[in-house]
């Protein structure tokens, strides 16, 4: 939606812009059946940049909680590295609804319930997209002067790009982390800023807890967190073999919650603003940015 809003703003709303979403309107931007399983931490400078450039400002309820930075802890938890910088914890269920509202006010059109499968080509250029209308099961085709791909790291459009381009189409499996998280409420247990700090996003580096990745405890209030972890699959296999276990990501997350001494009686959030987004797993890219982001008639944004 940010790409659409930017295009609308800089064209003075003179471009015809269409956003295509596979979801129905009430769940715009939803990643999986479980919710918007993606990052909800953002730097204040990024939000300020957006406000300055395209005159969009976020507030409550899409911004849920302010933070002062990130604190990363070593495996023995004796050493910490601070990364100071104001930021926000976003409510990923509410944010897309705000973005949709802002986009419509800027003249952006939205087509819901369409799953895109491939790009359309003509004379060596991308000229549109095609897929399926999920409500009618009929073919969907739409031409465009430029296609902006925001379908994520597993993009079928990028993977199937068939014109001459410097864009890397396939992503190495080792550059993807299997991740998951719960949004939880809790009572306060032991006052330990290593396990929970309402002012800082906490990262735990530990190859037993999160092999090839890290665990996180991100505050979403005084008694609410986004808690989860990410792992590299081959490192998880090595860890399981070393420890004689057969744990998966979900088991690791649940064990991670159990060892958190600052959280007493943790349970999934019952806030209406989290109603379809309290838990879930997803694949996250941890690689560098694609060296080339454009082809003739085609552009990548975000994780794509």
For every predicted segment, state its role:
Residues 9, 23-71:
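N-terminal FAD cofactor-binding segment of flavoenzymes
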Residues 38-41, 82-102, 182, 237-248:
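Short beta-strand to alpha-helix junction loop
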Residues 45-47, 154, 161-201, 258:
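Central beta-strand plus flanking loop segment that forms part of the substrate or channel wall
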Residues 66-163:
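Conserved N-terminal helical subregion
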Residues 211, 215, 231-304:
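FAD/FMN-dependent oxidoreductases across multiple families
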Residues 218-221:
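A short, hydrophobic, proline-anchored segment that marks a local hinge/packing element in signaling
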